[in-house]
């Protein structure tokens, strides 16, 4: 999963995981901000990239038969490093990691901006992140398929349909809630 702030990545990740017996890999950057009460410095970006990758590997090892949904992919750490700090030093490593993904879902910013606690950049930054992602596409597509998620409704269904077309169906209907 890639995309700027407030592009529906977490909602989509949770929805996909719920319908595929999947596991969501949470964001190391968010944990860093929660733990430190600030955004990272340029020299901390590499350790965040490695922490995100570690989370992905742990999820794959702990759940070898599950669909692993990365919210976001390690790639986003490198993209943010380039966007915030004009530092492209993480790009090659991020591309190597992207080659391990079956696909990347690119959540586009065509949904309303909803501020979350700890976010401070706003919709204009989200657009800048989306533009930078578009500049990474040729390299990303060499590593793995990139599937674009758009629209204000039905993103989970769109993602499922795109993934079905790419890999075949792994989806199930969510179990009804019991009232017992």
Q: Can you say where each PLM-predicted feature lies in the sequence?
A:
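Hydrophobic anchor at the beta1->P-loop junction of P-loop NTPases
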Residues: 1
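P-loop (Walker A) phosphate-binding loop of NTP-binding proteins
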Residues: 4
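Conserved lysine of the Walker
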Residues: 9
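Conserved substrate/cofactor phosphate-moiety recognition/catalytic segment
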Residues: 14-57
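Short glycine/proline-enriched coil/turn segments at helix->beta-strand junctions
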Residues: 18-22, 64, 99-100, 141-142
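A structural signal for short, well-ordered beta-strand segments and their strand-loop junctions
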Residues: 24-26, 68-70, 106, 146-148
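Glycine-rich phosphate-binding loop used to anchor ATP phosphates in small-molecule kinases
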Residues: 47-99, 106, 114
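A glycine- and Lys/Arg-enriched "phosphate-lid" helix/loop adjacent to the NTP-binding pocket
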Residues: 84-179
């Amino acid at each position: 999963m890639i995309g700027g702030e407030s592009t529906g990545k977490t909602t989509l990740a949770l929805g996909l995981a719920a319908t595929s017996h999947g596991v969501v890999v949470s964001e190391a950057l968010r944990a860093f901000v929660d733990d430190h009460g600030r955004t990272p410095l340029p020299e901390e970006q590499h350790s965040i990239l490695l922490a995100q990758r570690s989370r992905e590997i742990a999820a794959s090892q702990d759940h070898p038969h599950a669909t692993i949904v990365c919210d976001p992919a390690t790639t986003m750490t490198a993209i943010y490093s380039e966007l915030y700090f004009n530092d492209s030093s993480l790009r090659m490593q991020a591309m190597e990691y992207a080659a391990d993904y079956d696909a990347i879902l690119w959540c586009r910013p065509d949904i309303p901006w909803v501020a979350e606690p700890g976010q401070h950049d706003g919709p204009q930054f989200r657009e800048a992140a989306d533009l930078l992602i578009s500049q990474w596409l040729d390299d990303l597509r060499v590593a793995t398929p990139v599937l674009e998620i758009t629209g204000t409704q039905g993103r989970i269904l769109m993602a499922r349909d795109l993934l079905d077309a790419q890999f075949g169906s792994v989806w199930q209907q969510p179990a009804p809630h019991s009232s017992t």
